[in-house]
Regions:
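Alpha/beta enzyme core
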Residues: 2-248, 252-299
Length: 302
């Protein structure tokens, strides 16, 4: 609970749109993207000037404690997207379509994607998969829903892939990735995530497609980069992937703050006089007067 009010937000920078992202590729300007799953983190990432905020299904692991992304539900994704929406004013807000939200039927896939736009305020959705997602992408575009593709290491397919493994190492695998990328590009995705693939393959795809490529573990030749916010903050409980760069130790800061708070309370150092509220003098005087009167009345009855 906080009794302080928020500072008003002022940002004169223009709103990031699909056109903004595509224009950056044309001008060869790097595109930035980070995940965020709640109001506070989304607001901070937005105010830092990041181009895109992704409410990723990775929240299953970093926010909800699941072992992988598969268990997270539509309702959980909608809940977190709504929270992020309240924090994002400038960046492009993208919501991840969770596992089984677009696999069962075309009708259900469209309904779920539309819920992200209509109910949660997302401006685009991300869908994992290559050639086999072309019809879905086109169907969503027909409903005016922008789509970000995602190929390479697709976490929703970990059981099929045999775990979190780098993809595209053989000639056949490279050719399959190229087909996936070209198919999604032709279908009309406004951008595509390339995850866990060799740098050389990512560079080939980036040169081949018109849609901006956003790398995560795909080397520096993509049009942009995305990372999980909790990874760069060291706010996870698993060893980082090779491609993760740690920019802060938030886990260490939280642990220290919690220990210091505990020690201060147990040692009688918190709260201090300066951290306590006080009665106005006139109210204090009135209470003291009442107390005196009660004592006088009590003595009179003895």
């Amino acid at each position: 609970m906080s009794l302080t009010s928020e500072k008003p937000r002022g940002d004169s920078r223009p709103k990031v749109t699909i056109e903004t992202i595509q224009g950056k590729k044309q001008r060869r300007e790097p595109i930035t993207c980070l995940t965020a799953y709640d109001y506070a983190s989304a607001r901070l990432v937005d105010e830092a000037g990041v181009d895109m905020v992704l409410v990723g299904d990775s929240l299953a692991m970093v926010m909800l404690g699941y072992e992988n992304t598969l268990p997270v539900t539509m309702e959980e994704m909608l809940h977190h997207t709504r929270a992020a929406r309240r924090g994002v004013k400038r960046a492009l807000l993208i919501a991840d379509m969770p596992y089984a939200s677009f696999h069962i039927s075309k009708k259900e896939a469209l309904r779920n994607a539309a819920r992200f736009i209509k109910e949660a305020g997302a401006e685009a959705v991300k869908v994992e998969g290559g050639e086999k997602r072309v019809q879905l992408v086109q169907r969503l575009l027909d409903a005016e829903i922008p789509v970000m593709g995602h190929i390479g290491l697709t976490p929703q397919s970990i059981h099929l892939m045999g775990g979190y493994k780098v993809q595209g190492k053989t000639l056949a695998a490279v050719e399959a990735l190229m087909r996936d990328a070209v198919a999604l590009d032709r279908a009309g995705v406004f951008s595509m995530v390339l995850e866990g693939i060799p740098r050389e393959v990512a560079a080939m795809i980036t040169a081949e497609v018109s849609a901006p490529t956003i790398g995560i573990g795909a080397g520096p030749d993509c049009d942009g980069q995305v990372l999980v916010l909790h990874d760069i903050l060291n706010l996870t409980f698993v060893p980082p992937a090779k491609f993760v760069r740690r920019y802060a130790d938030v886990a260490g800061a939280i642990a220290k703050a919690a220990r210091d708070f505990k020690d201060d309370v147990e040692g009688g150092r918190y709260p201090s006089e300066e951290e306590s509220y006080h009665l106005p003098r006139e109210t204090q005087a009135a209470l003291e007067h009442i107390a005196v009167r009660k004592r006088e009345i009590g003595r009179a009855h003895v």
